[in-house]
Amino acid sequence: MINKKQSLTLLSAIALSVSLSACSVFDWLIYKPDIPQGNYMEPQQVEKLRIDMTKEQAEYILGRPVLRDSFADDTWYYVYHYKSGRDASITHKELILHFTGNKLSLVKGDYELSPEFNTPLEQSKLPMVNTTESAPQVPAQRPDEKPLVKENQTEAQVQKPIK
């Protein structure tokens, strides 16, 4: 038969095992933040890249790279690493720019380049912008000729003479 000391030991062992297993049962209740690291880039940004761009132009479009080779400044690394807090999925993307002199010569990585990448920026056509708005009109040219803003009196008109 089980005595009092054995039953107390058995009861404490059961309580300990139940309390430790509770940590894993309620794991889905614990908030885990998403962890983004590096350069997040939209595909539209990468599509703006053109061959023979200068380093300044590439940096203006993509931002500063995560890593520049300290011995050869002709290779720039843009790395994006994202770990989801909910399902622990990991997204990893890289974009590597190679420059010859000060001009962009090669792009490698996980992003798709524009079909116009091999057309230098000086030779590419700018998109047409259709504007339906007309140029601003001066009051004499507007149909109603009323001022758009109510004019206040100037300080000279408001001040009273000093006695």
From Swiss-Prot:
Signal sequence coordinates: 1-22
Annotated stretches, region: Disordered: 122-163
Lipidation positions, renumbered (N-palmitoyl cysteine): C23
Native source organism of the sequence: Shewanella oneidensis (strain ATCC 700550 / JCM 31522 / CIP 106686 / LMG 19005 / NCIMB 14063 / MR-1)
Identification of the protein by name: Outer membrane protein assembly factor BamE
Keyword Phosphoprotein: no
InterPro entries: BamE, BamE-like, BamE_dom
Gene3D superfamilies: 3.30.1450.10
Gene: bamE
Family that this chain belongs to: Belongs to the BamE family.
